[in-house]
Amino acid sequence: MVGKIAPIAVDAMGGDHAPGAIVQGAVNAARKGLPVVLVGPEARVREELARHRAASSLPLEVHPATEVVEMHDHPGQAMRRKKDNSIRVCFELVASGRAAGMVSAGNSGAVMAGAILVLGRPEGVERPAIVSVLPALKGAPLMLDMGAVVDCRPIHLVQFALMGEVYSRRVHGVARPRVAILSNGEEDTKGTDLTRAAAAALRRAPIDFVGYCEGRDLLTGEVDVIVTDGFTGNVALKTMEGTAKVVGEYLKRALRSTTVSKIGGLLSKAALEGMKKRIDWREVGGAPLVGVNGVGFISHGRSDALAVENAIRRAGDAARTHFIDEIARAVAPSHALLEVPADGAAAEQGPTPRRTAPRQT
């Protein structure tokens, strides 16, 4: 996407490979014209920057933060007691307008706590959510929540759907996102009290709600926004990550098993590399937060330079759309949607039937 924005603030001390991989990713992004401000202990960050040739000529600056949130720190306490920590300072730069967004591969709970504490929430938003972009067969479907709210109420799922629809439309450019709730079946009788209440409300929402989707639908790309509670979403995401890793290992072993398979592997190298890139979590870079007054991305703790660079790029893309301006308007009717009519008809009808072609068997 085009258009100049303020720098993206990057937590230089977050993640297993900080500050080396974080600084490398920031340098790579800056070399592609993306303005970046690295936040962390100034001497240490500048020492790492000195390893990179001509870094001083890049759109890259350093902003000091004297404290670091460790992975074992309690998120809320760390935000309040370590007031000059790199995560909080990143959010302060966003809140002041000196940064267009922030990226951190550090303590995800601390990132969420910092976002709420420093940025606050748009009017009407009950709880923010973490969004994941799935490596589907087509499109770039979103799933939320991925762990911010593990014990959800119907209002949370309804607002996740409305916020996810805005993000899909404004940031990913989907003209009319198809929204579904993750469940254990497509039938009206499936799901839980939580999902049925949320589905009944979303039937009345001004979005393209298509009802329930199942776990097998996550990577097909048939829907654009998949809504679930944070516990289920986090388990689903890590299951997909683990499955991709195991399938990749099976494939490598199979291609090395015989001379013929090795030749076949060489002939298929380009296709295999394309597939590998498609499912590589580093290509996504990070998970955006929705429901806070600013752009924030949580990157994987194992992020390397490629993941950090992509997270910076995606944060910049999100900031350019100003999608946050629409969040408050989107969630405004959420409580009214949950008000069941006197005859109870909406609640009894359950989710809207899926508007997709019948599955071939």
From Swiss-Prot:
Lipid metabolism keyword on record: yes
Broad class of the protein's primary localization: cytoplasm
Reactions performed catalytically: a fatty acyl-[ACP] + phosphate = an acyl phosphate + holo-[ACP]
Alphabetized GO MF terms: phosphate:acyl-[acyl carrier protein] acyltransferase activity
InterPro entries named among the record's database cross-references: FA_synthesis (IPR003664), Phospholipid_synth_PlsX-like (IPR012281)
Cellular localization per UniProt: Cytoplasm
Coiled coil regions, renumbered to chain: none
EC number per UniProt: 2.3.1.274
Keyword Cytoplasm among record annotations: yes
GO biological process: fatty acid biosynthetic process; phospholipid biosynthetic process
Pathway assigned to this chain's UniProt record: Lipid metabolism; phospholipid metabolism
Record keywords, A-Z: Cytoplasm, Lipid biosynthesis, Lipid metabolism, Phospholipid biosynthesis, Phospholipid metabolism, Transferase
Region (Disordered): 342-361
GO CC terms: cytoplasm
Binding partners and assembly: Homodimer. Probably interacts with PlsY.
Family indicated by similarity: Belongs to the PlsX family.
Stated role: Catalyzes the reversible formation of acyl-phosphate (acyl-PO(4)) from acyl-[acyl-carrier-protein] (acyl-ACP). This enzyme utilizes acyl-ACP as fatty acyl donor, but not acyl-CoA.
Protein name per its UniProtKB record: Phosphate acyltransferase
Organism, as annotated: Anaeromyxobacter sp. (strain K)
Gene behind this protein: plsX
